[in-house]
């Protein structure tokens, strides 16, 4: 990894067939260059947020990073818990900026480091962890020096780091994993620690004014590891010799200890640690949540004290629950990534996380259906869009996130919302086989093999219906005027030729709703009546599409049941 030069003071540092083939190759190269140039020009003025972020890096290095070095992107992970949707969000969004920068620069080299803060001392026992007493007995120790309560890895941190890597690999992210413990223990951070010790007082001058009076008495940029208990200590530290790393502090039992801060015998306070990492690794870009706004400010000052440069970055808003309250692990009011992937699709998750990172988002099951449908709507629009519009299309960015190219604008033949309405009629015990038999009314070659994306939507829709929709559906009896309109609809469906189109069916429904004899003040009232009497829901799909999918005979049975009620 990139390291900075060190200094001893705390000052700032800143044939015909052959000819034909060659001509063809030259023409292809020219066309490719023209396409690439057009992309670069469009990217330079794009207002899509990944390009806005990438443009910051272009200003940082107008001629590219010195020496042709790759621009370094970083994401952080605290391994006191398992990877979660926030972890995915940060790696995905950082990757989107990375790919935008590559497009903006015509392929400038980049790297993404996934950094694990596994030297942190364990402050409390996480929920839902086996062998909690094992963790309780090791509170305060670095996460990488605590036994694994799952019994599968060298330490608790090793277990969670493995989960992180498996998690990131599952989604195809391109990254390099770096462990804080490995860096501290191997001496990989010793040079950076030397610099911190040299600048100890200057760092205190940054941090002390931000602390309460009581905290100032014990605050030290360096946190020694007790030689007796192995706990990361929060005690005052006297720097004796930055070159050798020698420090003096009082241990938990009152013994005055002199030991080196190097080789894993200490770690740094959070804000100092973040700044040191930026400095040591040469980080150019890192984003974080709104809750770390002050950390960005103070760590930015500290990295400048060390002689480094604060990275570019984005401060994003945090998730809210369906009531607009902050999501809390202790409350359990959030949505896990496993839950999203049960009731939605991977593409829809990426799409939802792409949109407006600086705006607070509600995160609950109710937002998933719209995200699924909007993803495919944007996907279908992509091929027909001009280049500047493509760069503003979330799907363009998502398809390129892991090295792919923007797709050909394909889409799915049925919306997720329509699937939910179909399955809602079939009931809580609906099966995939049933759904595919109905899809045969609407989709050519209706099979999971021919339509894998649709198959994933069917899976998610079945789970959503089973757990959330079916228990709430309740059809009501139609009013007398609604019953007359339903009877008219049934009569017209009975006279239709085989295989009517969704549009033909929609026109029939539409004309009945406009018939003043049935007394609907607006078409919305008629559609609402259809949803409530036939589907058991206050809202629903375009009825023409639903009838085409469900089938005319089956729809007539629904009408008959409603009229009988």
List where the protein language model places each region.
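A structural motif corresponding to the C-terminal end of an alpha-helix
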Residues: 104-108, 163-176
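Basic, alpha-helical terminal appendages of large translation-related enzymes
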Residues: 4, 12, 19, 28-68, ...
